């Protein structure tokens, strides 16, 4: 018997409580009374707060960690196109129509064509809005395929648009806009802060009120079910407990992010992080007080996904539970659960994005990737999430790269000579050293790996024919992106989801269903819930089928601003 997911049940995996009915909101006692309450202050939350304040609404922003969420921790990429100012300065002609044609292939109907067109049409204006609020970009473009551009490049192809199967449908253009920061450009990390912090400062100038770390436990609804506010647990501003709590949380987060849990030493660091998190939680139990926030226009749930709620991932998306979580401890599913307590419907909760990047080093993308039978299943030059989707959804998360002696040597040259960032280089080095098997012949490699010998031999022959231009590759990979299997020895590199030293990063894409015109949360009957909105990874959005670099951040900004615009337009 399946346990229903509701507050207090074993399938809930959350501290979120049932919604509380406020019989008369006008007569109730409120600690804070504003037009808009934003729950979760990362990319989507700050976009909603800032855009609402720009239109004259009063805003209170609440966040349990006050660290910018996953947006502040990401690579600082915003997926944008249609002819942005940055694209034009770099000399690239892009249109909303070409952007739409490409994203339609990736979105696969997860949002309507009308919403996808709106996203593309508004994309140039989004970049202008970011620039207007102090976010900096540069127009130096990287022309080739890569998972992430070198430090001195700021515009790149952040998707599969250069792959053969896509160029036949849509004209490619570099749409990955990396923010510029002189400080972060020296270290190669922290670019996401250069996206989030200017928006946070702009929101403060517009009068957005922020509070000490605040955990929203309950939605407050009127007798008709409309959301009228939230109940949050928070510290007294400036208290010693607040400062100590922040210190424990910072330490815990740093330890969690220091190493993937699969790496040697990773589990130890995660256990150490749990100790600091427990100290923070003890302070929360001892010193927090409840405050009630009224939201006259609406509550925006923008608290991220649930990738760091490991029991929730294991229950809802077990095929991805071996992957490396990408996000922050605030991605615990609380925003989604809050929406459900008001009757909100969810979708795609078992759908995650995973990334198996094979370039850089470019040598890996020129090899062939096979499953447990020894059969290919994708174009190896695709964007990492497209490769991982095929591997995890259709091939049990199993994958091995097959390299001949020449490609193996080239891979080493790539990692030693090319300007790779540590997160691009180090896992590949470890995989080449410790996650490989070697054999003198392809037949011997098949036997060692347990491949079907007939299937593997046919795969290798077909790959060589396509690489030589003698046949069409069934996955659309161009001969220019392929290297035929030459002389041995031959290598099989483990790139499966269970690979300990070459982790597969994962991110949840499911969430609350929303009315696409407004961002209002929909109930199980498909009707909007008055006073409740969702944005970013708390909601279903443009990237909820297949992620490409910067698309989640762009969707956070788009959906946050969409919710703010609807609340500003609402009649009191």
Q: What residues fall within each predicted segment?
A:
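Extreme N-terminal leader/targeting segments of oxidoreductases
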Residues: 1-36, 54, 251, 277-278, ...
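A glycine-rich dinucleotide-binding beta-alpha-beta segment and adjacent secondary-structure elements
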Residues: 13, 455-542
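N-terminal Rossmann-like FAD-binding beta1-loop-alpha1 element of flavoenzymes
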Residues: 34-61
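Glycine-rich FAD pyrophosphate-binding loop
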Residues: 54-75
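Glycine-rich active-site loop/strand segments that organize a redox cofactor
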Residues: 79-119
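Conserved redox-cofactor binding core of oxidoreductases
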Residues: 120-289, 467-492
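Glycine-rich loop(s) and the adjacent beta-strand/alpha-helix scaffold that form part
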Residues: 190, 238-357, 562
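An anion/pyrophosphate-binding glycine-rich loop and adjacent beta-alpha core
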Residues: 336, 345-451
